[in-house]
């Protein structure tokens, strides 16, 4: 069975106390413990210098960081996890799994293109033409759907840069679509006044892409090196000194200093080139002080653009990074079960991360359930709609985006620029197994929300109740009962957010009973504007 990012991060999250976060009330950490604060060999890594600014490349300095209000208000972002691996339209991690004999993608590749020794990943790149790519139209579509920020993938584990890179000739400006994809997205996003960010997945590439240096173990091509073993191709495939196949671990163990330095130079170039408002690393903040200097540089560049106060966000999946205050925690395909004191983000996708023909997508209800479950817990949702090779969403994807648009336009008041209430939810547990409620990659274990599920947000003195179904005639919110520990005030008014319709209600020691019309104004859940409770 091929190794996937889910299995790697899932195993790491379950690996034991040496690898798990202990301070976070949220999910267990998905990578190693933080390094010591000031190991001498990392105080001034050669070549990792950054221009002066309010932040220095130390954890102590980065603890000055404050999450900007724009991110707290945004709640919903969209992501283009799109690059040359989308060209084949056979799903995520194609560039790795095509070199793992026996995997589905290996079999697909060898049947369509022939042996990997003669036709490797590098040879698929020209198929990524992006001939229908219209970033301005897509950003207009996503903004209408409620997206308040947007992220472009900048480099995946495949070592291919999506900008006109100073340090990597294998990039989208030189080959494939022959476009600076990152700047094309950035210009479209900033034209409609949204924050723009980039994702980097490069730090683990040294290990991830090492399988391209191997060969088949059996069969007619046994022992014939794949194209990654050719020294002429090392600029793409990386000169790894061993092959991580079945033993790929999502840690920095075995990654040499030269690669850490190279990572820093590449991603610093990305920050300087694109001037992003946020940066996402697929994993932890990597490489000790190389990483700290990189994040300090991101924050300093932002501060220079915003009158001395940084408006940038950095996302890490090592939860000690966010818990220590230096950045924002990101939870891949997961929802935490508590109200976090610090803003956080879930990143997920309606299908596979890279486009796959015939894949089964999340339904609009599943996406809206996630958004309604995340925001009351002080989180944001970052949603990827995987683009085909052409750069234009398929009809089913467009239908999903249209349904999300309809819902957010009717109910967005209860989502955007809100803050958590005293409790996030009322109703049965979203995950029956308590041990899985805060586990990594738990989205598939969460049940569909129903009329029994109520979620709460606030804005000023207004309380919002998001009811994820439509009861018959009436329903009761037990959390809004009189004389409870929640100290709920006397309810003065209840309205449907979608149409401002005033509703009859009754508040007792049993709860707040709301009388509703026969037909729901929104298909996938409805929100109620309640005054007097706060």
Enumerate the predicted regions with their spans.
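N-terminal export signals
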Residues: 7-29
